[in-house]
Regions:
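Glycine- and aromatic-enriched mobile tails/lids
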Residues: 1-185
Length: 185
């Protein structure tokens, strides 16, 4: 039944490939989607409609959903990072509680001008900014998927940051005078 297969695919993706991700669950998801792809070949067209034949169109779109799910799950599995839609807790770095994102701009300026010294920032801030910068060099890229006949191949393309420099985000602060959200009504 194509509708049952669609429901299973949806449940698998919603359970394992959202914002917080885990490599073991992602690997299992990739395997499960391959199973759905095999099962799709045996889907029956359970069309009882006497007008417009919606089931054949749905079966065709289900195939496309499975292929796109392969791209999403494999791309997620390959990206070991800690931010945005690729958040994996095992790769998270601890942002110092008193860190202000704008200090990263100062860090990059000092580094570019050759004026960065070990005592330019607090040690934990400097360590955080260095790790953040290394992570950008590795993962500030778009994932590009191509189909090889058996599944997706994932490659990467650098993101142009010449107009806006990326900087760390701080989710535990509001704009209003940096009052913590827990204390802000």
């Amino acid at each position: 039944n194509p509708y049952k297969l669609h429901a299973e695919l949806s449940e698998t993706m919603m359970s394992n490939v959202l914002i917080v991700r885990d490599n073991a669950r992602l690997a299992a998801t990739v395997e499960k989607i391959d199973e759905y792809d095999e099962r799709w070949k045996d889907v029956e067209c359970v069309d009882t409609s006497d007008w417009t034949n919606p089931v054949p169109s749905f079966v065709n779109q289900l195939y496309n959903m499975i292929q796109l799910s392969k791209v999403i799950a494999k791309g997620a599995l390959l990206r070991d990072e800690f931010r945005g839609a690729h958040y994996k807790p095992e790769f998270e770095i601890n942002q110092p509680s008193d860190f202000k994102p704008e200090s990263f701009l100062e860090y990059t300026k000092l580094k570019a001008d050759g004026g960065l010294k070990q005592d330019s920032f607090k040690p934990d801030h400097l360590e955080y900014m260095q790790f953040y910068e290394e992570s950008n060099e590795k993962w500030l890229k778009s994932s590009i998927a191509t189909f090889n006949g058996k599944g997706p191949d994932i490659n990467y393309e650098a993101v142009d940051t010449s107009l806006i420099q990326p900087r760390p985000r701080k989710y535990d602060w509001t704009r209003e005078r940096n009052v913590k959200k827990d204390n802000y009504l």
